[in-house]
Amino acid sequence: MGNNKKVCLIIVDGWGIGRNDHTNPIFLYKTPFLDHLKQNYPYYALQTSGIASGLKYLEEGSSEVGHLILGSGKVIYQAKTRIDQSISNGEFLKNKILLEAINHSKNNNSTLHLIGLIGSNETIASKEHLVSLIYLARANGFNNICVHLISDGKDGPKNEILEIIENLNKESTTLGSINIASITGRFYALNEHSEMYIDKFFKFLISNNQNQQEIQYLTELKTKSISDEFIEPFAIKNIFKPISSNDSVIFFNLKPNSFPIEYLANKLLQKETNISNLKITSLVDLNQKIKSVY
């Protein structure tokens, strides 16, 4: 007879090993079943961050990273780690796919649009990658850049976008102006559940009829208790340019096969949009239509 023993892997998302004090709700509440398992069966801890998860030392993990490692049964270096390494060793500045995207706008005298999330939690996108993209473009003699920031407010503090932008400008003095062209909350730009909100972001990006504001408009939103996640798309006066024919777009988010980004990219490429000769690139894989870098 065959071996009829069964194994069941149950992933309790968000559950972890914490301190035995008031900061740990798992410790404060009764968990008799799990206590029984610990008392009667062997167990051990898994590290869900840093090098063990294919990230930088001490870097915070995420559910996407954890599920990938568990499913593969081995450490897979995340896109962020690979990109960070390429920036450190100089390979990023020689990347053919990125240079193609920049030269497309350069040769067509058009605009390079950089689109991605920005926040203190860098599991979805990285400020360093954004700065490196701007540096790469300017190192190749191209300055016509529009940065479309997606504010977080979900995986990080609720109102940090203005502070992050101020710090970004301070840290990037050698680059000159970052050219922030628009800001949109992730509820609209990265909504996993409703295409309607992504459509609003899409129409915003291709239209000239915008809610035009100064960057300090973010202070007004904060006083109204509007968190970064729910900021409706607004354009920065005198900087915003809509995505148009002959332009180039680089998405710098790090989540592969992201539905919102893939949906947005596909919308931009539709014939009905009437945007021709548009070049779209992503740092990570979206689909077979879009060139990916890593």
Regions found by a protein language model. Give the residues of each.
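Hydrophobic transmembrane signal anchors and adjacent membrane-proximal interface regions, especially
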Residues: 9-10, 147, 200, 204, ...
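Short alpha-helical segments and helix-capping/turn motifs at coil-helix boundaries
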Residues: 21-22, 29-32, 53-54, 97-100, ...
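Short, flexible hinge/linker loops that cap or flank conserved catalytic cores
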Residues: 1-2, 243
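Short coil/turn linker and secondary-structure boundary residues
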Residues: 29, 93, 128, 196, ...
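Active-site nucleophile/metal-coordination loop of metallo-enzymes that catalyze phosphate/sulfate
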Residues: 2-8, 16-187, 276-294
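Long, well-ordered, tryptophan-enriched scaffold segments
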Residues: 156, 160-244, 256-259, 263-266, ...
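Active-site loop/lid in soluble adenylation, ligation, and acyl-transfer enzymes
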Residues: 14-16, 248-253, 259-294
